[in-house]
Regions:
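Terminal accessory/targeting
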Residues: 1-71, 77-144
């Protein structure tokens, strides 16, 4: 990578260690792994903000000493509060994308509901309940 190029690394779930996690089957990055990622990345990349990205893309006089790394988080999860404290310790600005359903309706995004349901009940139970719901609302194509 050239020095004024950048990549973006997106995180979703930043979880406690499996043995302490209420949802151990939820696929994600544990807090220690996240911290280790940042330590590894800081030696090879220059952490940048969305403002920096704007400057780079608009070919201003902005200059990076190393390739840039933008750290982002999707879905507006409570996990990200813990991640923000870690970012602050490293002096890194993260970009957090929060779905409008979280702020307007106080509800998680649909994929989050699915992920937690599968983590709690398993895929077979989830699919069984999903099929029942499809039948209840006449959404199941009987040919399938």
């Amino acid at each position: 990578m050239k020095k004024n190029e950048f990549v973006s690394l997106c995180y979703h779930y930043i979880r406690p260690k499996k043995e302490l996690d209420e949802f151990p089957k939820l696929l994600g990055t544990d807090i220690q792994q996240f911290t280790d990622h940042l330590k590894m990345l800081e030696g090879n990349y220059e952490f940048i903000s969305t403002r920096d990205v704007f400057e780079i893309l608009n070919q201003s006089s902005y200059s990076l000493n190393n390739p840039g790394m933008l750290i982002t988080f999707d879905d507006g999860l409570s996990d990200h509060f813990e991640a923000s404290k870690i970012l602050e310790k490293f002096g890194i600005k993260g970009t957090f994308f929060i779905p409008s359903c979280v702020t307007e309706n106080n509800l998680p995004a649909n994929p989050i509901i699915i992920h937690y349901s599968i983590a709690k009940f398993g895929i077979k139970k989830f699919l069984s309940e999903y099929e029942l719901a499809l039948k209840k609302f006449n959404l199941l194509n009987e040919k399938n």
